[in-house]
């Protein structure tokens, strides 16, 4: 769990929007019911290999909540770390891209920190291109969230602008599901330039080096 406030005793819904501004790509997360800003996403490059890191910021305080970093150079693996640090002790999960050249149903395997088995705690499955994806507990467990991509106009799609509607079940870590939504966007739209988020938060996290600590 990232923070207690991101676990609700009732189902919740969010809108994740990626737009391109003069500063580059900007991702924003809003509560579907109230329209209130929940998170903003800053994209930076990390280390000498220029790997991507996506920093999920609290919209009110601009405090880093979760940092999603690429691990390795094949764009197939990400790790999520609480806050803006790089300590393995703060890692929340590792996500591994399981698709080949064609979608086969399972998009991501997600291993929570402490899971040293080959069995994922969660999977993201469905079809990105059809705009319907589900987050389920691993091993054929129950669905905990739905990620849907809105069908926008052709000009928006060609420019890489997307809107996702995310429905999350009760007692599910919203920050984890929202981070997976950002990863799903990144794995299918690897065109985000290094930029500041829409709040003009500085890219001070870019000096960190990234390494793989996972057994997966």
Regions found by a protein language model. Give the residues of each.
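Low-complexity or membrane-interfacial segments used for flexible interactions
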Residues: 1-53, 59-64, 73-76, 83-216
């Amino acid at each position: 769990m990232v923070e207690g406030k991101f676990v609700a005793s009732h189902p919740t819904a969010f809108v994740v929007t990626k737009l391109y501004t003069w500063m580059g790509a900007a991702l924003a997360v809003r509560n579907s019911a109230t329209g209130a800003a929940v998170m903003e996403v800053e994209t930076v490059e990390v280390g000498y290999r220029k790997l991507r890191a996506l920093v999920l910021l609290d919209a009110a305080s601009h405090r880093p909540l979760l940092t999603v970093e690429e691990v390795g150079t094949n764009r197939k693996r990400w790790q999520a770390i609480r806050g803006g640090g790089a300590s393995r002790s703060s890692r929340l999960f590792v996500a591994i891209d399981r698709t080949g050249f064609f979608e086969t149903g399972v998009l991501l395997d997600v291993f929570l920190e402490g899971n040293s088995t080959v069995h994922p705690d969660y999977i993201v499955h469905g079809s990105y291109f059809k705009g319907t994806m589900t987050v389920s507990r691993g091993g054929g467990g129950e669905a905990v969230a739905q990620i849907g991509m809105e069908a926008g106009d052709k000009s928006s799609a060609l420019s890489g602008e997307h809107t996702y509607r995310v429905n999350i079940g009760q007692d599910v870590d919203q920050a984890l599901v929202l981070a997976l939504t950002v990863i799903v966007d990144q794995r299918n739209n690897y065109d985000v330039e290094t930029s500041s988020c829409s709040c003009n938060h500085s890219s001070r996290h870019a000096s960190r080096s990234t390494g793989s600590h996972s057994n997966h």
